[in-house]
Amino acid sequence: MSRSGAAAEKADSRQRPQMKVNEYKENQNIAYVSLRPVQTTVLIKTAKVYLAPFSLSNYQLDQLMCPKSLLEKNSNNEVACKKTKIKKTCSRIIPPKMKTTSSKSESTLQNSASAVHTESNKLQPKRTADAMNLSVDVESSQDEDSDEDITPGLDDFSGLSPYERKRLKNISENADFFASLQLSESAARLREIIEKRQPPKSKRKKPKRENGVGCRRSMRLLKVDPSGVSLPATPTPPTLVADETPLLPPGPLEMTSENQEDNERFKGFLHTWAGMNKPSSKNTEKGLSSIKSYRANLNGMVISEDTVYKVTTGPIFSMALHPSETRTLVAVGAKFGQVGLCDLTQQPKEDGVYVFHPHSQPVSCLYFSPANPAHILSLSYDGTLRCGDFSRAIFEEVYRNERSSFSSFDFLSEDASTLIVGHWDGNMSLVDRRTPGTSYEKLTSSSMGKIRTVHVHPVHRQYFITAGLRDTHIYDARQLKSRGSQPLISLTEHTKSIASAYFSPLTGNRVVTTCADCNLRIFDSSCVSSKIPLLTTIRHNTFTGRWLTRFQAMWDPKQEDCVIVGSMAHPRRVEIFHETGKRVHSFGGECLVSVCSINAMHPTRYILAGGNSSGKIHVFMNEKSC
């Protein structure tokens, strides 16, 4: 009976359910441990530990200290409270025989887990709810055998795997190594040395501001020297007056010579004009000469010192030869508003030069009247057009416009009663001398930005040609409108600005233009239609620069198939070209030492006059005419 009862009791003990306690053991990444005991049926004796990986890469030097200091520094009240509760719970559940073994494991595991607890909180602060349940199955009959000793000091971790025990050993060794380096003590000593070397900071005393003195200013602006003495006042520079000559008063001006003091000689000169107040009966309608005879006459023209005259003080802008057959009179317009007249028949030659001042700015255009040879008309940049009457010794005002600047003019009628005037701003004016006053009859604008020259067709006088900025237009005076006029024909072959454009003097069948692209162009204008063809392009250096008057190719009034133009070549010369482009003749000599930009030929006699930029005229003439 006793044996059977013992066997039954032993079988009941095997079938009796055993209690499994979730014992709190500090391990890596343990953030929460359940304190509620769980009853489980234990079939075998097992010990299970769930581990989570972690890293020491985020540890700082002051955190890698000895395990004892780490435990004191990183343990908090929450862990202590949880440990106390677990101990109380386990004491009620674990038998006395089992407490001895559990206390040893708990104390050792607590030390290692507290060191990892800080790292777990830093790496995964949000995962406090993820806890690992460490369950230990305790049998009713616990063996007295102790765990194997693998590593000294780790006897209480016999339930861990060899990897975990090696890992805890490495943690302990690393902590001991960093503790032996004494980094905290070295850092403290270095900090003390740095603080000792820093000089004491001294507070800078702000200077007291003197009463009445504001912001600091330079002595130059205060106009004082370094000693504080005021400097003398800087002399003010003289005011620069604009280089503009005031306009002459409106109305007629008395004709007085600026370079002749002998009034009796000047009066005698004026009386000689009485016999020249009628136009010459000779004309040039007999036809053109042959090129051979024309060249022979040109070869007979010479220059000498007696035919070089100093007339004006500034550059010559315009020139005209009187059509007289008996006297040789050359008129020039200069830069400073002067009009000079040179009588080549007067001896000595200084007595034959007379200079007048009817304008205040450059005289850009000059003509003797075709109806009255005793009249000379001059146009200036100052916006005035005057007529000099030598029989009355007076300069009458024909047209005045102070708001505009004139560039050129020509006669629309043979009796010189109506004029066409070109403006520098591209406008054009019709002027009738028979109308009282000094105003225009019609003012019209053109599509040209600037007008340099105006020339009327010699036969069909209703047509006139204008030259300007890359444009050459032919207009009909009968179709001019106040609101703007459109040209009949435009010559568009030019690539740069055009200095001049002139019809041939007898028939008007040709047009010659002088362009800044170093070309002379001759057009066929025999039929004024929608297009005027280009006949010839003559290569010629027209680049005069800033200080020389621009070249203007002119037709020879006796030979309308030949043009006269100045030259930049050396030695200095004046050249004549045929309309085919061939050079007919070249004027030169020892007395010609400058560039003659403006040239004029006598309408019936073989006399050529050229003006330069110093106010001199050079006259080439036949020896019989000298």
From Swiss-Prot:
Residues 199-208 have a biased composition (Basic residues). Residues 140-150 have a biased composition (Acidic residues). WD repeats lie at residues 311-352, 358-400, 402-441, 446-485, 493-533, 535-565, 590-626. Keywords: Repeat, WD repeat. SMART domains: WD40. InterPro entries: WD40/YVTN_repeat-like_dom_sf, WD40_repeat_dom_sf, WD40_rpt, WD_repeat_DNA-damage-binding. Residues 109-123 have a biased composition (Polar residues). GO terms for molecular function: DNA binding. GO terms for biological process: DNA damage response; regulation of DNA damage checkpoint. Residues 97-108 have a biased composition (Low complexity). Pfam families: WD40. Residues 1-20, 97-161, 194-213 are annotated as: Disordered. It comes from the Eukaryota. GO terms for cellular component: heterochromatin; nucleus; site of DNA damage. The keyword Repeat applies. The keyword Transmembrane helix does not apply. Belongs to the WD repeat DDB2/WDR76 family. Specifically binds 5-hydroxymethylcytosine (5hmC), suggesting that it acts as a specific reader of 5hmC. Interacts with CUL4A and/or CUL4B. This is WD repeat-containing protein 76.
